[in-house]
Amino acid sequence: MTTKTPADRVRGAAAWTAVAATVPYLTLKLLWLTGHQVGVDDPAEMDKLWLVNLLTFGMDAIAVLLALSFVRPWGRRAPAGLLAFPMWVATGLLGTILVALPLSALATLLFGAEKAPGGGSGNQGPGGLDDWVFVVVYGGFSVQGLALITAFLLYAGRRWAGLLRSRIGDLPDSPTLTLQRALSGVAAVLALGVAAARGYWAAGGATGLPVLFAEERSRSAAVLDGVIAVMAVAAVTALLALVFRARPERRLRVPLVVAWTAAGSLFGWGSWQLVVFGTVTDVTDPRKAVPGLMPLVETAQLLTGLLVLVVGAIALVERAAAHATTDGTATDGTTIDGTAAAARAGTRGAQTPAARTPTPRSTVARTTAAVESAG
């Protein structure tokens, strides 16, 4: 029987907390999808959003699977990419909320509560939803984000321990380095455009926004724009530090975590806003029409995040290949589950010479494990 470490217990508690935090949101979405207008002031408006509700239900269901993968044995055997991509998006979406919500609360404390559109008050929030819906949804997102990201950090610390211990200078000077730097330059240009546009909107600018959206724009929306502007700058700054090997003695995990979170935010929120505004095809009020600048910024935001992901993936795959050894481990001493290579070396030493003779199939399997474990 395997003895659980304190980190294992925290990881398990965080993962199950994340699963529990999805229940209110999934229940609410399921009610809406089945025609129950709970917390909805305008049922006709909700009927137009069935596709968005279906998509968000699926996204939160994926979050449940991610949380389970961090504590179940099959999660340690799952291909890295199968877990990394959805978790990258989840980190970006939920991480942005975790940053924006406290800032919005601080703004409320400093400047007072906002009045509802039209100067009224009452219990109706934006979009025809009751205020309690936003408390349930974003309260759940906050708990889910903290718990899921905590579970993932502990999972990654075990599975990719060698990668997280390495330094920027350990990245190889590969033949694709010129391409990586070129793509990073494109990402930087796009990111600066995104940061400028989002910063302008955060400061109160209205050019490029739907007229009605600009008139009824909440303080929270401005805070979100400001956070995304910062994320755009942070993502490319971290990426440039990696591809140009800035301060090679520095731990790789610092720019890696920044690039991971910020690029995930750009990709996740850019994609989400394109979907939300793109699914509204029946626009009867000209003031709701979306100008061309807004989807252009969202597309640039999505592409920036995607470029950071691609360049980062190339760099890490090449690092994995450079650190792989013939016995199926990485030269930094970690295996697929992050344990020391020596743990398996002792077992191999007890085998007979015939048992230690690798077959072509086992060699391929161990090499694949080495690539994954090293990066």
Q: How would you label these PLM feature ranges?
A:
Residues 17-28, 89-100, 138-147, 179-202, ...:
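Alpha-helical transmembrane segments of multi-pass integral membrane proteins
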Residues 27-39, 102-118, 196-210, 270-283:
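Membrane-helix interface motif
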Residues 1-8, 158-184, 323-328, 332, ...:
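Membrane-interfacial, low-structure loops and terminal tails that flank and connect transmembrane helices
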Residues 2, 11, 15-40, 45-113, ...:
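Transmembrane-helix bundle segments that line or gate the permeation/cavity pathway
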Residues 69-90, 240-263:
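Loop-to-transmembrane helix junctions at the membrane interface
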Residues 56-66, 139-156, 227-238, 298-315:
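Hydrophobic cores of alpha-helical transmembrane segments in multi-pass inner/ER membrane proteins
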Residues 42-56, 210-231, 292-300:
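Transmembrane alpha-helix entry/boundary detector in multi-pass membrane proteins
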Residues 115-129, 214-216, 280-296:
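Short, membrane-exposed interhelical loops at transmembrane-helix boundaries
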